[in-house]
């Protein structure tokens, strides 16, 4: 095809393969190559990937909150708030890995949080390839001007030039689906953006302009602190399209020791190990509006009530605290998501977790930390967002099948078992689910309450194959301190042969007589114990019954295997051991 002043050809792509966001389909891309030839013989050639998609949006009659449609299909928004590195020194590979990890977490969009700035092209290119939608907040927004510095605004010509360049930089990316005026308030110069800049530089209507992050069909405001897991199911903010839901997300011990001052010698009264370094890295109590209690001490209270205070006030005690924090992470992140699941499409049309990542070493608000480690809550979060999911609703003790495939699912069987700590069966139930419609599908029974500590194992079979399983520790008063007294579990690993795509299958078996909790796998170098990051696992922090065997896969290792590769396995009640390749 050739364009000349006399021949402005129309570009027609017959029956194109559509670009779909993750969970709805494949993000098909095309490449357009343009070459400009001047009469003097000079030429310039440039290639641009692009995708073909259609975006629509409306307010749900059921929730009165926003719903997005891509290529004619409703999209339940599963998002995260993304922030840039504090020193702006990430490599291109790191930006790409941030996107890949988001898709692996079952997210279909990321919000580039307003004050964080404008990421490089690598970030958007990866989002195009992975099918991760992006919301781009504009700079110099409500937070960056009027809220934090009343009366401040950059010169108009500077703002206009910066905003123009942002629009031109990102407008060709199919992953871009939202422009947003800014964080928690309209942009002070919204009229310039919507009246001049967007109509001039992005007039094609392939994305939507959102006035503010918590307006125009979205809501925000947390909760930003950890709640007891059951309370998420009745919290009024766990509804609508919530743009910021934020449990704490304490990182793993291996990350904590990177930035804490050890040994800890002084700490807040009755709150070991919380000292000034913890506070500096965001473990603070701060006020919040509308009854919001942004207090890290509330998370610490939950750890101490549910799992017990650290056993000692030395480094061993810190490791004990970190292990108990992972138990809390696991139940908290799952509860927040399963509370949304319980109202899927009826009261909820989407969410964005606060936050997806961290811009520096932090002890809260993250599912992937600054070192690219995923804590236990990252995996329970991911599990709760699987296409077909079975869950226990903590508020009314019902069991439900969640279907987010977009189509009815048939030939489903739900199995539920309750055990005491000695693995004695206390209750069993099977039910065939005729057809699980998109959304939440309660079963016909509830799980009876039992005295003391018990374990609930749920399985969902589709065509005879287990497609979802879930494991809960339950106690009427939420006192789980007895977990610390569980006998050590023996877990065996069997490494398979690397497949053509580089994926390595790993079979994990509980060979003990009791449950194995939060079984964690790490790729390490055997002689040094140094962990290889990032390393993507299809699942991790496993909870296994006696004799239970699962297969997970290790894949996505950008740096390649370490010199002497090995897998370390450990868990809350699983002594660490190493299996070499």
Each language-model region and where it sits:
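Secreted/periplasmic carbohydrate-active enzymes, especially glycoside hydrolases
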Residues: 1-111, 118, 344-348, 373, ...
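A generic secondary-structure signal
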Residues: 101, 165-169, 197-200, 335-343, ...
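Substrate-binding clefts and catalytic carboxylate motifs of secreted carbohydrate-active enzymes
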Residues: 233-410, 415, 426
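Short, flexible, glycine/charge-rich loop motifs used to bind or transfer phosphoryl groups or to couple energy/partner
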Residues: 20, 100, 167-169, 229-232, ...
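Short, well-ordered amphipathic alpha-helices
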Residues: 11-14, 33, 195-196, 334-339
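Long, contiguous hydrophobic alpha-helical segments, chiefly transmembrane helices and signal peptides
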Residues: 19, 52-55, 77-82, 102, ...
